[in-house]
């Protein structure tokens, strides 16, 4: 593990392999350990760099104070890539990290060679939301879903809150199916969810999607339900240089559930 001083914060990161740089941005309740299952394939012929965002493990944050805001994390990601001094990178973002990566691609396309967005998290402006799916404000991936889970954590029911979040994304019983290591990672980052409810995340707009200039691969899990696949399809339909790949037999955590299939679609895209 290395650290890099970014915007007055020591950002921890993994740095493995040699070659073209790939930077991976993790999602909610995750950290650089989220990428363990794909470290080998992604770093075989590339330099893989996976940071933990501000207030995630290895920091043990209690959810109070600090600067846990979406705009802060976007600024941190931009500064991190700049301070690496490697020139344009291939940027992979999953879930909340996909939202961060999307915004980096909008604000600083000069820093991006190619962009991979694995079910980017967030909501849609009305100009992107299909009419027949307008009742998803309470479902998986919504702010209400995060709020329900964080309220249980704040009340002292740590496992109950984490279970509600994971089961809400991946379906009933998903928490029980996690390995002990995956559960521990969520527990280590549980209190970030308290701040995530009011992080100031902006909805995606049609103008945002149309302005995304880097070549972008949207990756989804075939079994994902709720708002996430709707967001993916809406963004991919309007981004000018977009491709889409759907991973069979996988849900929202597709790169952990089907790591080989994930790498088989991502690596050829990055190599082209």
Which positions does each model-derived feature cover?
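Conserved HGGG/HGGXW glycine-rich cap/lid loop of the alpha/beta-hydrolase fold
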Residues: 9-66, 80
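Conserved acidic catalytic loop of the alpha/beta-hydrolase fold
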Residues: 71-89
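Gly/Ala-rich beta-loop-alpha elbow adjacent to hydrolase catalytic centers
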Residues: 93, 97, 101
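Flexible "cap/lid" loop of the alpha/beta hydrolase fold
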Residues: 102, 106, 113-153
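Conserved alpha/beta-hydrolase catalytic His-Asp/Glu region
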Residues: 153-194
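Conserved serine/cysteine hydrolase catalytic core
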Residues: 181-237
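Catalytic histidine neighborhood in serine/cysteine hydrolases
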Residues: 236-252
């Amino acid at each position: 593990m290395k650290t890099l001083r970014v915007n007055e914060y020591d950002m921890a990161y993994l740095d493995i392999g040699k070659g073209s740089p790939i930077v991976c941005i993790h999602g909610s309740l995750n950290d650089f350990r989220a990428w363990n299952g794909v470290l080998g394939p992604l770093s075989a012929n590339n330099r893989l760099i996976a940071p933990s965002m501000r207030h995630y493990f290895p920091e043990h944050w209690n959810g109070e104070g600090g600067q846990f805001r979406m705009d802060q994390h976007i600024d941190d990601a931009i500064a991190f890539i700049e301070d690496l001094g490697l020139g344009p990178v291939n940027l992979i973002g999953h879930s909340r990290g996909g939202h961060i990566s999307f915004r980096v691609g909008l604000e600083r396309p000069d820093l991006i060679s190619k962009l991979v967005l694995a079910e980017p998290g967030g909501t849609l402006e009305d100009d992107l939301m299909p009419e027949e799916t307008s009742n998803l404000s309470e479902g998986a991936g919504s702010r209400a879903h995060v709020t329900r889970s964080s309220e249980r954590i704040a009340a002292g029911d740590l496992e109950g809150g984490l279970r509600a979040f994971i089961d809400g994304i991946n379906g009933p019983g998903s928490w029980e199916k996690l390995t002990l290591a995956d559960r521990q990672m969520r527990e280590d980052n549980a209190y970030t969810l308290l701040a995530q409810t009011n992080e100031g995340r902006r909805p995606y707009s049609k103008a945002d999607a149309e302005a995304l200039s880097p070549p972008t691969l949207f990756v989804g899990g075939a079994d994902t339900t709720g708002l996430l696949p709707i967001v993916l399809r809406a963004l991919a339909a309007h981004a000018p240089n977009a491709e889409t790949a759907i991973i069979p037999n996988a849900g929202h955590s597709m790169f952990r559930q089907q790591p080989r299939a994930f790498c088989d679609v991502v690596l050829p895209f990055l190599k082209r």
